[in-house]
Amino acid sequence: MAEEFVQQRLANNKVTIFVKFTCPFCRNALDILNKFSFKRGAYEIVDIKEFKPENELRDYFEQITGGRTVPRIFFGKTSIGGYSDMLEIDNMDALGDILSSIGVLRTC
């Protein structure tokens, strides 16, 4: 069931971030992504509280990404990891270029 829950939310040309809103790392990751202007439908925030039991979901994250923690961030169906991974990309000034290359940003 966790696999279906996650896979239904992942799509090409979309950024998906799985969060827990009480998590400070999740809020920080959302702050980074909120600097960008996404096309409609190209960015989805998924609260992991929507899935029970949460441990099953975290087990599936570990299986497909190597990590159980949130945030879990996907560009298309590819995991880029968590907050520290995205922060590193952002600090290299590469995040905007990556998001542009996958076609999720507004161009105007």
UniProtKB/Swiss-Prot annotation:
Disulfide bonds: 23-26
Keyword set includes Transmembrane: no
SUPFAM superfamilies: Thioredoxin-like (SSF52833)
Pfam families: Glutaredoxin (PF00462)
InterPro entries the record matches: GLR_AS, GLRX1, Glutaredoxin, Glutaredoxin_euk/vir, Glutaredoxin_subgr, Thioredoxin-like_sf
Induction: Expressed in the intermediate phase of the viral replicative cycle.
Cell compartments where the protein resides: Virion
Keywords, ordered alphabetically: Disulfide bond, Electron transport, Redox-active center, Transport, Virion
MF term (GO), any: glutathione disulfide oxidoreductase activity
Gene3D superfamilies on file: Glutaredoxin
GO CC terms in record: virion component
TM region positions: none
Superkingdom, taxonomy of origin: Viruses
UniProt domain Glutaredoxin: residue ranges: 3-106
Function: Has thioltransferase and dehydroascorbate reductase activities.
Family the entry assigns: Belongs to the glutaredoxin family.
Family annotation (NCBIfam families): GRX_euk
The name this protein goes by in its record: Glutaredoxin-1
Organism phylogeny: Viruses, Varidnaviria, Bamfordvirae, Nucleocytoviricota, Pokkesviricetes
